[in-house]
Amino acid sequence: MSIDIDDILAELDRDTTAVEQNASSYPDQSDRTQGNDVSQIRPADKAVDPVAPTQFNKIDDYQKLITHWKNERMSPELLPYPHHLMTRTLIRIQERIELIETLSMGYLEDNQELTVDSKLPLLCMEAELERLKFLVRSFIRCRLSKIDKYSIYLRQQSELPNNAGLSRLDLLMSKEEVKYHMKHSDILLKLFNNAVLKHLPEELQAVNDTEGSISMIDEPDWNKTVFILVCGGVVDESGIDSKLTTDDDGKHCYSVIIEDLNEEIYLLIGAVYVIRYSVIRDLMTEGRVVLI
């Protein structure tokens, strides 16, 4: 299923009025919303759609979205796009907008004149909707800024042999983000070529040269220092966290290796640490730690 990011941002940037406006895993992208507007989804489609909001706890989804937002803002790399979660969230936003419109027009009330007391729940709903919309806007804008920053790096990844790169991009980004990235990188490369590269010797015209002391490709800083909260709680089918261990004091923790120092350290459940991103990247992807 696909969502048009341009439409989303345009919709979310509008001023909210009473007649205009609650809504840690990385699922795959096998199901996406068809069309440019989530309002085009029919009730019959929602009933059989594996990402239908009614089949998931909205509070859990909201907490997952906050976790994705925190990780995206604090991580040096572009993280996998939560396709199913974002689809459910956008559907809930559309449904809540429609509900607020209905309530504000008084269609559900015998007396269609709204009193001060009857407006209070409506105002609370609008406030919660604005909170969710801010979260979605911030999440998408953060991702777009990383796509801009690492444009050449991502393009290089998309050109891996046997379509491995394109498959990776499809998992890493939404369909619209991939299209945005391709168009943006094309414009950027054309600008570089017209302004500078075509005036240089042929052997100096490559923009993806990694030889020499300085790479021309801006890659994520894998050794960036980040703050993390060790949350744990990830279990397999047998109900056991396979990576959970205990330290010398018998406290539950995760063991990680700092390769440069060849040193093993223990991350206690519930504790906060400052550590290199590359050391805890796998734990973050699995949902065992959260960036803060």
From Swiss-Prot:
<dbReference type="GO" id="GO:0006261">
    <property type="term" value="P:DNA-templated DNA replication"/>
</dbReference>
<comment type="subunit">
    <text>Component of the GINS complex which is a heterotetramer of SLD5, PSF1, PSF2 and PSF3.</text>
</comment>
<keyword id="KW-0235">DNA replication</keyword>
<dbReference type="InterPro" id="IPR038749">
    <property type="entry name" value="Sld5_GINS_A"/>
</dbReference>
<dbReference type="GO" id="GO:0000727">
    <property type="term" value="P:double-strand break repair via break-induced replication"/>
</dbReference>
<protein>
    <recommendedName>
        <fullName>DNA replication complex GINS protein SLD5</fullName>
    </recommendedName>
</protein>
<feature type="region of interest" description="Disordered">
    <location>
        <begin position="16"/>
        <end position="46"/>
    </location>
</feature>
<comment type="similarity">
    <text>Belongs to the GINS4/SLD5 family.</text>
</comment>
<dbReference type="InterPro" id="IPR021151">
    <property type="entry name" value="GINS_A"/>
</dbReference>
<dbReference type="InterPro" id="IPR031633">
    <property type="entry name" value="SLD5_C"/>
</dbReference>
<dbReference type="GO" id="GO:0000811">
    <property type="term" value="C:GINS complex"/>
</dbReference>
<comment type="function">
    <text>The GINS complex plays an essential role in the initiation of DNA replication. Has a role in chromosome segregation.</text>
</comment>
<dbReference type="GO" id="GO:0007059">
    <property type="term" value="P:chromosome segregation"/>
</dbReference>
<dbReference type="Pfam" id="PF16922">
    <property type="entry name" value="SLD5_C"/>
</dbReference>
<keyword id="KW-0159">Chromosome partition</keyword>
<dbReference type="InterPro" id="IPR036224">
    <property type="entry name" value="GINS_bundle-like_dom_sf"/>
</dbReference>
<feature type="compositionally biased region" description="Polar residues">
    <location>
        <begin position="18"/>
        <end position="39"/>
    </location>
</feature>
<keyword id="KW-0539">Nucleus</keyword>
<dbReference type="InterPro" id="IPR008591">
    <property type="entry name" value="GINS_Sld5"/>
</dbReference>
<dbReference type="Pfam" id="PF05916">
    <property type="entry name" value="Sld5"/>
</dbReference>
